[in-house]
UniProtKB/Swiss-Prot annotation:
Family: Belongs to the UPF0323 family.
Membrane topology: Lipid-anchor
Compositionally biased intervals (Polar residues): 160-171
Location of the protein in the cell: Cell membrane
Protein's name in the database: UPF0323 lipoprotein HPSH_01205
Ranges of Low complexity composition bias in the record: 172-210
Positions of the UniProt region annotated as Disordered: 160-217
This protein's GO CC annotations: plasma membrane
Presence of keyword Lyase: no
Coiled-coil stretches: none
HAMAP family per UniProt: UPF0323 (MF_01421)
Secretion signal span: 1-27
Lipid modification (S-diacylglycerol cysteine), residues: C28
Length: 217
């Protein structure tokens, strides 16, 4: 049986979440007349989606193992036995709401120093909600809570830890960079911040199809 991640090519490669980093550094090098066009292009890219595969770990936490731009957002959960299923929109929204409550009361792993603290269900890793918000999909689905994570230094570090490995994170960055507007046309790109909430605030949350520094050692 073919797994969903082997059929990623079926989805249009159009996202562009790494463009969030670019938009924050558009400065004097950009022509004033080009800015409206650039902003429009970025806005359209951000409002697209991401195909994300989350893998269950032995401690019942979850990690991002694959992530690609997509015409719509799909989140696939793979359990310890290798079984996969696509989260429904209702499941995703419930998980994000639960994680938002943790962010509000300071117990979310995403904002804990050194990835510490949090609830007992996330004793040594990230739960589904925090893994989703740490991924590219989180910048789309959780855009309305971006202000709560924006410029949070702990989030900047922990967001990358939601990825299974540095290689998984780099594949994601490369994938989204390829689908984003070219850096040369926007005065270059900054790599000073990590996490998809790190440099801009998406303003809308598109429909879900039912279907960054330092890693854990």
């Amino acid at each position: 049986m073919k797994k969903p991640y082997r059929k990623i090519s079926d989805y249009a490669i159009v996202g562009g979440l790494s463009a969030l980093v670019m938009v924050s550094i558009v400065g004097c090098k950009s022509n004033a007349d080009d800015k409206p066009k650039e902003q429009s292009s970025l806005s359209q890219s951000v409002q697209k989606g991401a195909f994300v595969i989350l893998e269950e770990q032995k401690d019942k936490s979850y990690k991002v193992v694959e992530e690609y731009p997509s015409s719509r957002t799909h989140i696939v959960v793979r359990d310890l036995q290798g079984n996969e299923r696509v989260l429904s929109n209702e499941e995703i929204q419930k998980l994000i709401k639960e994680e938002e409550a943790k962010i509000d009361n300071g117990t979310s792993k995403l904002i804990q120093p050194n990835n510490g603290g949090g609830g007992s269900n996330e004793s040594s890793g990230f739960g589904l909600g925090s893994a989703i918000l740490g991924s590219a999909a989180g910048a789309i689905l959780g855009s309305y809570i971006g202000n709560k994570l924006f410029n949070n230094p702990n989030y900047q570090q922990n967001a990358q830890r939601t990825y299974k490995s540095p290689q998984a994170y780099q594949r994601s960055q490369n994938s989204f960079s390829k689908s984003a507007p070219s850096a040369s046309s926007m005065g270059g790109a900054s790599k000073g911040q990590s996490g998809f909430f790190g440099s801009s605030r998406p303003t809308s949350s598109p429909a879900v199809s039912s279907g960054t520094r330092g890693f854990n050692s």
